[in-house]
C-alpha cells in the first residue's frame, strides 16, 4: 500500500514538472518573438531616419546647386546708372558666384523699349527683375505682378508708382532703393556757395516724374531762403541746348536734379553754361562732373550694391518683397569741381570733397 502511494506521488510530481517546463518554454518563445519584433521596429525606424537624412541631404544639395537668372533693364547709359548696375551685379556675384547670371539690357533712353525688354524678361520667366531708373521700374511693374521687381536710382517711389500716401512698402512684388538726396540739404549748400545770387533756374526734363518731384520740392526750400526760382524744362535731348541757353540768360545759377536726360547731355549743357559764366549745382555726382561746380550726392555704386543685397535676401533667404521697405543711400557727400569753382570765383568752404571734371 505504501508502495502504491509512493508511486502516485512520484507520478504527480513528474506531471507538475512537465507542466512547469512547458510553461517556461512557452514564455521563452514569447520573449524571443517580442525581442524579434522590437529589433524589427528599431531597424525600420533607423531605415526611415536614414531615408529622411538622405532626402534632406538631397534637398540641401539641390538648394546649393540652384542657379538664378536676373534681368536688368537700365533706362539709359550714364555714369550714375552704370555705377548702380555695377554695384547690384557685384553684390549678387559676391554672394552667389557663378550661380547667378544677368541679362543686362539698355533702353537707350526710350521708355517703350523698357517695356519690350521687361516683357521679354517675363516671357523667359526670370527669377528677378531690376529696373534701373523710373521708366525701367514702371515697365517692369507693368509687365509682371508675380516676379520680384527691384528698383534702383528711383527718386520717389510714390510718384513713380502712382501711390498716394506712400509709406515705404508696396504690399506687392516691388521694392528697391531710392537715390533721393536731402533736398533741404541741397538748398542749404546752394545758400552757402551762392549767398549773393537772386535768381535760380531749375533745369530738367518734363517727362521724368522724379525730376518734377525734386523741382517742386527744392523750389519751396529755395524760396524760403529768399531766392526767385524759375523752372526751365525740355521734353527730350533735342531741345536741351536751347532751354539751357534760356536758363543761363535769366538766372544767376542753375540747379539740375537727378535727371536722366540731363545726365546724358552734360556736354551740351556745359557748352552753353561755361561760356555764359553761369554756375550749376547738381543733384548727383555724375552731372556735376559733366557740367556742374558742386553737388550733394550719393554714391550710386553703393546704392546698387545695397539693392543687390536685397535681391539676395529675396532669392535665397525667401524674404517677402511686399513687406520690404525701400532703402535709402547710406551716405551723402558734398563735392565740388575745383577748376570750375576757381574760374567762376566761387569760394568753397571746408567740408567739400574735390572731384575731377569729365
Question: Which residue ranges define each predicted feature?
Answer:
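Sec-dependent N-terminal signal peptides of Gram-positive bacterial secreted proteins and lipoproteins
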Residues: 2-24
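Extracytoplasmic "Venus flytrap"
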Residues: 65-97, 103-113, 207-211, 259-264
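Flexible loop/turn connectors
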Residues: 286-339
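Hydrophobic alpha-helical segments within soluble ligand-binding/sensing domains
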Residues: 63-64, 157-199, 298-319
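Beta-alpha junction/loop-to-helix N-cap segments that form part of ligand/metal-binding clefts
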Residues: 104-165, 259-283
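An alpha-beta-alpha
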Residues: 70, 88, 175-222, 320, ...
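Pocket-lining segment of extracytoplasmic ligand-binding domains
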Residues: 209-278, 284
Amino acid at each position: 500500500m505504501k508502495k502504491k502511494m509512493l508511486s502516485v506521488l512520484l507520478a504527480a510530481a513528474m506531471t507538475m514538472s512537465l507542466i512547469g517546463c512547458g510553461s517556461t518554454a512557452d514564455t521563452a518563445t514569447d520573449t524571443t518573438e517580442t525581442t524579434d519584433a522590437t529589433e524589427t521596429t528599431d531597424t525600420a525606424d533607423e531605415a526611415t531616419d536614414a531615408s529622411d537624412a538622405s532626402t534632406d541631404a538631397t534637398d540641401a544639395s539641390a538648394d546649393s546647386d540652384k542657379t538664378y537668372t536676373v534681368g536688368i533693364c537700365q533706362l539709359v547709359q550714364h555714369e550714375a546708372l552704370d555705377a548702380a548696375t555695377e554695384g547690384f551685379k557685384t553684390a549678387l556675384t559676391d554672394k552667389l558666384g557663378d550661380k547667378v547670371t544677368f541679362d543686362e539690357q539698355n533702353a537707350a533712353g526710350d521708355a517703350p523699349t523698357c517695356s519690350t525688354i521687361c516683357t521679354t524678361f517675363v516671357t523667359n520667366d526670370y527669377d528677378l527683375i531690376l529696373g534701373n531708373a523710373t521708366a525701367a521700374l514702371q515697365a517692369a511693374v507693368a509687365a509682371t505682378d508675380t516676379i520680384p521687381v527691384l528698383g534702383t536710382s528711383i527718386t520717389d517711389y510714390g510718384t513713380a508708382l502712382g501711390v498716394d500716401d506712400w509709406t515705404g512698402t508696396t504690399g506687392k512684388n516691388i521694392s528697391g532703393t531710392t537715390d533721393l538726396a536731402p533736398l533741404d540739404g541741397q538748398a542749404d549748400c546752394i545758400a552757402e556757395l551762392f549767398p549773393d545770387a537772386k535768381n535760380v533756374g531749375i533745369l530738367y526734363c518734363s517727362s521724368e516724374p522724379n525730376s518734377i518731384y525734386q523741382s517742386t520740392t527744392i523750389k519751396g526750400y529755395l524760396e524760403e531762403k529768399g531766392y526767385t526760382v524759375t523752372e526751365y524744362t525740355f521734353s527730350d535731348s533735342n531741345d536741351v541746348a536751347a532751354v539751357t541757353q534760356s536758363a543761363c540768360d535769366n538766372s544767376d545759377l542753375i540747379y539740375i536734379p537727378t535727371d536722366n536726360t540731363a545726365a546724358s547731355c552734360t556736354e551740351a549743357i556745359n557748352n552753353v553754361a561755361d561760356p555764359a559764366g553761369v554756375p550749376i549745382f547738381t543733384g548727383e555726382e555724375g552731372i556735376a562732373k559733366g557740367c556742374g561746380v558742386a553737388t550733394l550726392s550719393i554714391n550710386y555704386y553703393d546704392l546698387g550694391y545695397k539693392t543687390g543685397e536685397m535681391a539676395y535676401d529675396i532669392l535665397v533667404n525667401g524674404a517677402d518683397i511686399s513687406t520690404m521697405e525701400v532703402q535709402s543711400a547710406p551716405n551723402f557727400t558734398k563735392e565740388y569741381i575745383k577748376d570750375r569753382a576757381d574760374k567762376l570765383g566761387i569760394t568753397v568752404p571746408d567740408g567739400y570733397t574735390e572731384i575731377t571734371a569729365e
